[in-house]
Amino acid sequence: MTTILSVRLKNKVVIGGDGQATLGNTIMKSNVKKIRSLYHEKVIAGFAGGTADAFTLFEMFDKKLAMYQGQLQRAAIELAKDWRSDRMLRKLEALLAVADKKTSLIITGNGDVIQPEDDLIAIGSGGSYAQSSARALIENTHLDANQIVRKSLNIAANICIYTNHNFTIKELFSEK
């Protein structure tokens, strides 16, 4: 699996993730880019789960964003509907964390589109470690969103065997 973390704080939203791809208990690749900019760099997204499945979903999500002119929530809901109802797509195993300048969402293969109350998203095998760390840093420091994502991913990578220290981090300026 992996660790993907998104933090929205003050005027920024940041999504970061590690680069490890595993097959069973073997590391197959250490520099997979699991974080992407989509729709004219107005949306950032990360995935946890099967790499090929996630790339398929990224492509589909980018098409939905284009179809709905960058409306993140609408594109996410339409992707989730397709993902849930299409027999072939239902077999894809991945989670997406997506964000634009206003909204952060988790999209699942069950057809769920979840907007977290606190604009903090953590998915993947190291997600709970990264989320715990991020919560503590948000509540007890004055670090910015980028620093919180970096430090939290580092902590997750030190604990989770399916997460490495090869991070990709993207950010957008936020309206919140």
From Swiss-Prot:
Stored PANTHER family: ATP-DEPENDENT PROTEASE SUBUNIT HSLV, METALLOPROTEASE TLDD
Organism superkingdom: Bacteria
Keywords: Allosteric enzyme, Cytoplasm, Hydrolase, Metal-binding, Protease, Sodium, Threonine protease
UniProt organism field: Buchnera aphidicola subsp. Acyrthosiphon pisum (strain APS)
UniProt subcellular location: Cytoplasm
Enzyme class: hydrolase
Activity regulation annotation text: Allosterically activated by HslU binding.
Protein known as: ATP-dependent protease subunit HslV
Encoding gene, per UniProt annotation: hslV
Primary site of residence: cytoplasm
SUPFAM superfamilies: N-terminal nucleophile aminohydrolases (Ntn hydrolases)
Highest classification ranks of the organism: Bacteria, Pseudomonadati, Pseudomonadota, Gammaproteobacteria, Enterobacterales
